[in-house]
Amino acid sequence: PAEAIWSRSVDAEPTAVCQVEGGFCFALRSRGVYRMDIEAKEIWRASMPSVIDGKRRGQETAISMSVSGEILRIWFDNGLVVDLSMEDGSELDRRNLRVGERIEAVFHSKNEHLLALSTGGIARTNAEQVLESHPTSGPVMAARYQDGAWEFTGWRIDGRLFEGILEISKRTEIGVGFVGQRVLTNDGTLADFPFTRS
């Protein structure tokens, strides 16, 4: 694009991206993981971690990335979590979070994460194990961590998870994101989030 600061073409679909100190990292489907500096110069590239779960070999997708200290964490839709070194992209650790279904999205806070599951439902994790899970009446589209609670919106629902207690409120439209303290819905409206913070 004419007004871009920089642009690069890629030969596969980007499936996850995250900001890191001095640049960003991204994953390309079936290709690999890349760390770039702020000028889009490659710092390192690593092969996509091999994924074996017996059912969908080769079809898993890296859907999210997060950073914890010097670790780049890759989250896959089948529950696999792979830790890579921020220094050189080498694999440090891997584990499988047992959630029972495909993960649609991962929302991150400093010390924990919220998984949005494909048929509705959420699971809270510390990236090592699932701490709790709850069904929802539809898919969760957006979530954020505020004042010790997870707040989320989605398919005709808003919700709040605080100290193991899940509160749900139904809505007419589909919540697709948060704008400040309000919910953006699929019809372009900004609506109030129904839960007040303590």
For each feature predicted by the language model, list its residue ranges:
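Short beta-strand elements that form the blades of beta-propeller/WD-repeat-like
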Residues: 1, 22-27, 33-34, 70-75, ...
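Surface-exposed loop/turn elements that mediate protein-protein interactions on large endomembrane-trafficking
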Residues: 1-7, 34-51, 80-96, 120-138, ...
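A sequence-composition feature that detects small, non-aromatic residues
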Residues: 2-4, 12, 16, 27, ...
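Solenoidal tandem-repeat scaffolds enriched in leucines and small polar residues
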Residues: 6-85
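Repeated scaffold domains used in trafficking and secretory/extracellular systems
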Residues: 9-21, 52-66, 98-111, 136-149, ...
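Repeat-unit-sized solenoid/scaffold elements
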Residues: 29, 38, 42, 46-54, ...
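Eukaryotic tandem repeat interaction scaffolds
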Residues: 60-146
